[in-house]
Amino acid sequence: MNRVPVTTSSRTYDVLIGHEILRDAGKHIRVVLPKAKRAFVITSAPVRKHWAGIVTDALTAEGFEVIFLEMEDGERAKNMASVEDLALKMMAKGADRQSIICALGGGVVGDVAGFVASVFMRGIPVIQMPTTFLAQVDSSIGGKTGVNLKAGKNLVGTFYQPWLVLADPGVFSTLPEREFRSGLYESLKCGVIRRPDLFDRMERDRQRIVERDPGLIEWLITESVRVKADVVGADEHESGERRILNFGHTIGHALEAETAYKYFLHGEAVAWGMIAVTMIAAGLQRTDSATAQRIISLCLAYAPLPKIEVNAKKTANRVKGDKKTVHGVTHFILPREIGKVEVAIDVTDRAVVQAIEELKYLSFVG
């Protein structure tokens, strides 16, 4: 088992990473919440089918009363209606301020459950139990919670750190191939923004990674978590350095919104977003052609990314509604070299439209 501490101004907690760690979930939770009695496990139907038994046994062994609450999975369920539905179900089941929430699922479940925990009775503890690669290396860590609006992604939310994160790579045995590969892009992002060695490893050992080599996957998760923990620890509320974690996300979120969250998996949209801002960086001569080619090639190598058929101008307009837009100026994270990025405010609307047009072409010709 690997332990990565996350130290923020509001809370310090551990991310525990290891195969079979869910079987000891109750013991680990009991260490940080010795008096808790009732655990509301928010999950989706497919995840509950595979992992409810193990989680129930682990929690009841430590004296927890376990209550499962199901929500739909996918970005379309990431809305205020889901929040109200879960909160009302918790009230009906007798939840109080001594209750805890366990978020058992992917990024959407974690974001929604975390948001519910942050606002239910003005805040109750939340334990993150991520079941996708993407959630284990990114969304379960750092305290970002929230839901989408029709106008854009994650526009209503809170910063609310979990009490503990339990990342069990063993759950990937039931994870569909497309979802697994989609999640790998968050690790690739970590390599570009901070860790050249991680990027190099993903280039060198791509075949072993896509074949889910257990030791390599655990290493990849652990090192990606270290990047996230370091950045979040330095900037909990995204006022400065934490913005680098949005590499690829600004245009990626616009692609998701333009397709009504029905077409791309999150990691796939981020991959296209990373390619787009890399093209922009090369056009602005912020990075050299060799670096740009390495990033673009690795993004294309890890998965067959969905074709892009959106209207470039409409998608570019959605970028302006991104939460990273301040006083009408959108902040883009551009790569300079592998392991180093910059926050740019001089990217024109025309450059964004052109990048999306280039993505469309690239998505069809490969």
UniProtKB/Swiss-Prot annotation:
Keyword Coiled coil applies: no
Domain of life: Bacteria
Main localization, broad class: cytoplasm
The entry's keywords: Amino-acid biosynthesis, Aromatic amino acid biosynthesis, Cobalt, Cytoplasm, Lyase, Metal-binding, NAD, Nucleotide-binding, Zinc
Binding site for NAD(+): 73-78, 107-111, 131-132, 144, 153
Amino acids binding Zn(2+): E186, H249, H266
Gene Ontology CC terms: cytoplasm
Pfam family, one: DHQS_C
Cofactor: Co(2+); Zn(2+); NAD(+)
Pathway: Metabolic intermediate biosynthesis; chorismate biosynthesis; chorismate from D-erythrose 4-phosphate and phosphoenolpyruvate: step 2/7
Record's keyword annotation contains Ion transport: no
UniProt subcellular location: Cytoplasm
Cystine connections: none
A GO molecular function held by the record: metal ion binding
PANTHER family with a match to the protein in the record: 3-DEHYDROQUINATE SYNTHASE (PTHR43622), 3-DEHYDROQUINATE SYNTHASE, CHLOROPLASTIC (PTHR43622:SF7)
Protein family membership: Belongs to the sugar phosphate cyclases superfamily. Dehydroquinate synthase family.
Job description of the protein: Catalyzes the conversion of 3-deoxy-D-arabino-heptulosonate 7-phosphate (DAHP) to dehydroquinate (DHQ).
Name recorded for this polypeptide: 3-dehydroquinate synthase
Lineage: Bacteria, Pseudomonadati, Acidobacteriota, Terriglobia, Terriglobales
